[in-house]
Amino acid sequence: MATTVPQKSAFDIAGKYQVYLTWCELGACLFSVVSTALSFFEFYAYIENSVTMISVAFLIAICFFQMRFRSTYREAESVRRDGLIDHCFGTIMADTQSEGYYDSVDIDSGFKKLLASIHESSLLSSVIVDGMLKRQERLTFIGGIFVVIACIARSIQSELLLAILNGFLSLRLLDDYCELHALRTEIRNVLEKCKHICEDRANSRRKTFSAQQQAHLIRECIRYECALAYASIMLDEDLYQQLNPTHEKAWKAIKERYYD
C-alpha cells in the first residue's frame, strides 16, 4: 500500500519560500541596525545611496516572498484538507499520486477517523505552536527594540524611506507574534472541544455518532482548518522532530482510552 502524502510536494515548495522570506527578514533587520550605526560616521555620506537601494531591495524581496509563500501554502493546505477527507471516508479528492493510500470505510467509521485525526493534529499542533510562540516572543522583544531604535534614529536624520522600512520590519515582527498567539488560542479551543466530544461519546450508550456529535465534529474540523489557513504559518519541522516522541506517548494514552 502506497504511503505517499499528496500535499508533501506542495508543502515543500511553500517551505522553500518561507525559508527565503525568513532570511530576507533577518537580513533586513541586521542590515537596518548596522546601517543605522554607520550613519553616525562621516564616511556614511559616501554609501548613503547604496544603503537606500539595498533597503528598497530588501523591502521588495520581503513582499514578494511573503506573497509567494502565502499563495503556495494555501494551495498546499487545500490539498491536505482533501487528503484528510479521503483518508477518513475513502474518497478520492486529493492528488492521484496517493492512489492506494485510502481505505473504504462506512460513514460512522469515517467520522471516528476524522475525530481522531483532528484530535491528534490539534494535540501536536498546540505543543509545536507553543514552542514557536516562545521563540517568537524573544525575537519580537529583542529584534523589535533594535528596529524601533533604528526607526527613530532614521526619522531624526530625516531619512524617511529608511524609517518606513524599519517601521515595516517592526510591524512584521509584531504581526508574526500576534498570528502565532491567535493560532495557539484557536487550536487549544479545538483540542478542548475534541476532548469534550470524546467524553460525550464515552458516556453515551450509542455506538454511533449522533447528529449533534457529527455537527460538533464538523464544526471543530472547520475551525481547525480555518485557523491554519488564515494564519498561513507552517509548523516548525525541527520542533516537530523534537516533540514527536513525547507526543506519541501522550496520543497513545488518549487513543487507548477513546478510540481503540
Stretches with model-predicted labels:
Residues 1-2, 138:
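Polar low-complexity intrinsically disordered regions
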